[in-house]
Structure formats: structure tokens, C-alpha cells
Amino acid sequence: MSSYILFGLENPLLDYYVGGETATLEKYGLKSNDAVLASESQMGIYKEPCVSYSAGGAAQNSCRAAQYVLPPNSTVFAGCVGQDKFADMLLESNEKAGLRSEFSVDPTTPTGVCAVVLSNNNKNRSLCTNLGAANNYKLKDLQQPNVWKFVEEAKVIYVGGFHLTVSPESMLCLAQHANENNKPYIMNLSAPFLSQFFKEQMDSVIPYCDYVIGNEAEILSYGENHGIKSTDVQEIALALSSVEKVNKKRTRVVVITQGADATIVAKDGKVTTYKPNRVPSEEIVDTNGAGDAFAGGFIAALSQGQGIDYAVTLGHWLGQECIKVSGTTLPLPKKQFPLP
């Protein structure tokens, strides 16, 4: 008997680590701590020497992180991949993490790849994504009975904002299901460019969101592109939390991480801050995926019926463990979360 309590949707990608640090950033017009979809002029980055590979894709990372702290067979992730070795690597990585993959397959398009450039002694990361097959996910893929049964079984639905560029229809379908069944519906803001260039799609989903997770750059972009005059992270988070909701049974919670600085939670017109434990710089190996790991801990806690304090604390712990190892991974053998 399965017990899949968490369903995630976004883009299954393979992270492709590229060396060169700031020289590579300059060569391809990239910024540190940013995420972009690759333009034609940036496609050459995927021919740069590869330092290492790891399974990526923001929400996929979060679902693997959630499964790290949840009982076996708790988490399902959906998206579209190609029919190639990269897809095999993703499936293998998810299986190793205990994450169930419900992928549609497009044999004509390669699996999506995300170039990762680390800089500043691996403390900063820049992401440049070629979506590939991930861009071809369709609503009909989600509605296949063998996939939809996991949506119906789930207690919590998590969607990555990057899917706004792919299939907002699928995001809305999940949102409506969550609303009708009073399940928490969580979206990640994912990247600053989404609020700017996919504003209409984002604004169609936000009213359904019970929780919105993001970082400082993402919430600032949201404010700038939604006519919010303030550049204060707390004020913008409060404004987003008060956008009208479809499901009136619960108020919206906006959760904003700020790296090593305090995480902000805006809810019911109030802001609460949570200071994460600081990881000594000599223990930091790779900051890529820290925000994904935080989101994974947060959604794992919610799927088990835990409150916000616990969810933020678990998210912080997973984020801290993630940056101590290379890639968007977590330590093995598994560590146990030190319960408060």
C-alpha cells in the first residue's frame, strides 16, 4: 500500500557544472545568483568542459530533499524528459533518493540541461537552462490516470514557478484540484525573470496559492513588476500574502529566504523572522540547491501536518546540510533531523 502524500510538478533537468567561474559568467553574459533560460548566444555553454553532473531541476531537487526526511514512498514528481542517457541518469538519481518519477517521454527532444557556474569560492551560483524535453509537458500528460491517481492521493501539491514557461494549464489544473479538496497548494517563485516576462501566467496561479516560497531577488522582482513601490522585502512579502485568494479557508503564507540571513514569513498582515544557524565558511562546498533543499524541508513538514515554525526549521536544516556537499544532494548515509 503506497502512501504518496506529496506531489510535485516542474522541469526534470540534469545539472551540468561548468568551470571558469567569473570568466565563464562574463563570456556568456550571466550574473551570479541568477537563473535564466538560455538564449541562442548562450548555447555554447553546454559545450564547455563539464566538471560534474548531478540531477537538478528546482522542484525535482525539492522533492528529493522532502523524500530525504519523509517515510519511504511519500513523494512523486512529474515532468517531461527525452529518451536518452540524461533521462536515465535522472531516473536513477531519483530512484536512489526514493523519489518516484512519473515522467512523460518525448523521444524527439533531448532531456533538459541546466548549466551551473559557481563563483566566489562556490558561495555564488548562476544557472542557465536549456529546457529541452521539459518544455514539452502537456496537460494531457498530467491527466493520464496513472499520474492523476497520485494527485488525488497527495495531501500537498507543490509546483515550481519555472513550469509557468511550460504548462501553466497543468499548474492551474493542480491548483483547482487542491482548492476543491482543500489541500495546501504551494508555488515557488523560482527566478526573478518569471515575474517580469511571465507575469500574466504567474498572476493566474497566485490566487490559488496557499503558500508562496521564494528568495530575496525573486520577491524584489515580484514587487517591481506588480507596481509595489516599496523595495523592502518584508513589505512586498506582505503585499503578496494579501493578494485575493480563491480558497478562503486558509490565508496565504509567503516565505522568503535570504541565504545566511533571516527567513521572512508574511501571514495575516504580520511578519515573523527566523534566523538560520550559520554554516562555517570552511564547511561550505556548494551553495547550488540550498533554496531547493529549504523548500523541500518546508513542504515535507506541511505534508505531515506540521506548523510553520517546524517547517522553516526543517527547511533551514536541509539547506545547511545541502551546502556541505557537492551538487544538489544531501549527505549519505542519511542524517536524522534533530527534532526540537
From Swiss-Prot:
EC number(s) stated in the UniProt entry for this protein: 2.7.1.20
Annotated Gene Ontology cellular component terms: cytosol; nucleus
InterPro entries: Adenokinase, Carboh/pur_kinase_PfkB_CS, PfkB_dom, Ribokinase-like
Catalysed reaction equations from the record: adenosine + ATP = AMP + ADP + H(+)
GO molecular function annotations of the record: adenosine kinase activity; ATP binding
Disulfide bonds: none
GO BP of this protein: adenosine salvage; AMP salvage; purine nucleobase metabolic process
Active site: 292
Record-linked Gene3D superfamilies: 3.30.1110.10, 3.40.1190.20
Family: Belongs to the carbohydrate kinase PfkB family.
UniProt protein name: Adenosine kinase
Gene symbol of the encoding locus: ado1
